[in-house]
Structures are given as structure tokens and as C-alpha cells.
Amino acid sequence: MRLNQTLWSTFLTLSAIVLLASCSSNGSKTSRNSGASDVDPQKFGAVYQGRSYQQAILAPVNQVENKSAVINQGDFLAQLSNIHSYSGKLSSNFAPIYDKVTAWVLAGANVNELNNFGIHSQVMKGFDGYQNVLMTGYYSPVIHARRTQQGKYNQPIYALPSQKRFSRAEIYAGALKGKGLELAYSDSMIDNFLLGVQGSGYVDFGEGNLNYFAYAGQNGYPYAAVGRLLVEDGEIPKEKMSIQAIRDWANANPSRVQGLLERNPSYVFFKNDPNGKVKGAAGVPLVPMASVASDRGVIPLGSVLLVEVPQIDNEGNWTGEHKLHLMVALDVGGAVNGHHFDLYRGIGDQAGHIAGLSKHYGRVWVLR
């Protein structure tokens, strides 16, 4: 799937969510649906009361049933601005709906008035036929590091070598040491690993600004999901698996971390792009909670979506609420299939925490 840097970054980002958090045993990426199927989906925001089974993937509706306010109008307009600046193709192809939705937003974004602006809505079938679309999350991590090895900062982040066919274990054993490939040294082997799984992220050198580390390549070895390994080993119950659970296990078992990670021979290399921005497969910088990764066979890149986002607390429990967000489909991933969206949560630990807990359900309306 090495189409370009962005797409591979997305591929690995989504693997973080699906393969770490849901512990899927399938080869590359599978729907995180399997992670929530062992329990009642209603505990994760799925709703059935008052709904009829829907056969069509997308069904036109006269009105959006959720009457709550859209809460991210400003972020959505910022996302559209990024599209206009970075993608003439999407701007041109979707100009009519972008213009209509912009006018609707500026007029107050009342869902009862969509038809007044010539906006037509189609509701997605959902994984179950009752409009319950699976929603996971991804984010951009921030790694604390130094430019040279010093004290606790002794875990290297490598640039792409000319000879990259070394396994993770060989790299940990020093196969790349002294070749001038060290971009940074962090203080955490598990943080470096998760940066590799995300495929890109930010590095804080303690100099007052963040440096973007973009995906540069991979060593050619297959990816093994460490979350699945921890479940199989009996270390973490499947229903408790999340990125945070992996971090907690690593903090409690520092002497075992390297052995676990070496069971995943895949290794990702980076390049320093100080002025870089987090972009999706469409090549457009992403605005948190105004952009999603989708299955482009169902939802083409550039599509405008009204998303009923399930609200969760800091432990990942659904609060009983959904809130409406306007979003644009700007990313893809092999793990995002059918009625499954991956919501971009933003930068840093809190964004990562919520992303790692997200495996909930809500409705999605495609606006045309």
C-alpha cells in the first residue's frame, strides 16, 4: 500500500487504533467493529429504539432527526479553508456542496433548515442496518526528545537507511548505530514504538516549538499487533485493551518491553519536516474533529458529513449523549471499511487518550 508518504502514514495511524486497541488478529487492518462485538453495542452509543432496518447503504431522508446544534462550525470552516488552499481538485469537484453548506453554517447551521439551502441528506446504513456507524479515533503523538544522546534520552529515532532490511530486534541490537541516521533520542522505547505505529507525529526537543516527523519508510517486515500479543499472553483482558493499557503495561514491566516489541519485526523510519502539517490521504491539513478517515468506496474523499459523535468520558464510557459535528472525509485506511469512520482527534497525549478509547457508535448523514 506504499502509494505515498501520506497514505502510508494513514495506514500505520489506523493500525494503531485497530491493531493495538481492538487486538484484531487479521493481517493488515480490520474493522475495529470486532473489538466492540463482544459486548452490547448499546453501551457504546448504538441506538435501536424507534428505528427501522435500512437495506440501502445510503438512504435519502427528508430531515436530520437529531435536532441538537452543530458544535464545530468554526473548525469546519477552517477545514474547508484548508481544502481550498491545498486541493484545487476537491475544491472544484465539491464546490456546489461546499458553497451551500458554508452559507447554511453562516446562517446558523440549523438542521431544520438544510432543505432551505438546497442541501439533501442521506443517512448511512450503519454496521447493523440501524444507522449505527462505528467511530474510532486517531491522533498525532508528541514525543519528548533531544537531538543528541544524553542521560535518559537514549532511545534513537532513525532516518531511512539505504539498507533497510533489518528486523526490529536487529535494529535494537545496534544494526544502525553509528551510521549518522539518528534524528532524535527520546526517553521511551514504547513512545518510539507508538510513534512508528501512528506513522507520523511531533517531537518536542525542549526548545519551545514542535518538530513534525513524517513517515519516511518501513523495513519491509510484517506488522504484528502487540495488543493482540498481550491479550493472547493473558497480560491484558481483551475488553480492557487500549493504547493507554499498553502504556500502563509497559510502565509496570519496563524490563519486558523490548522483548514484547521485538515480536513485532516491523520498524518505521522518519524524516524531520519542521514546518510539516498533519495531512490525510487527500493531501489536505487536518483540523481536529472536522475531518475523518473513511472507506472511499462508500464515502469519497471530499464528502461533507454531518456526524453524530458519541460523547465519552475519560475512561471511555459513553455518557448517553451524541453531539453533531460537520466533517469532511479527507483520509483513508485499510482498517476503515464500510460503515466505520476514524475521527482525527488532534495532537498530544489527551487526544491520544481519547482516540485510544474510542470504539463507539453514532449516525452519519452525507450532505449533497
Question: Where in the sequence are the language-model features?
Answer:
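Solvent-exposed, well-ordered loop and adjacent helix/strand elements within mature globular domains
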Residues: 24-368
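C-terminal motif of bacterial Sec signal peptides marking the signal peptidase cleavage site
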Residues: 20-22
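Bacterial N-terminal signal peptides that target proteins for export
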Residues: 2-11
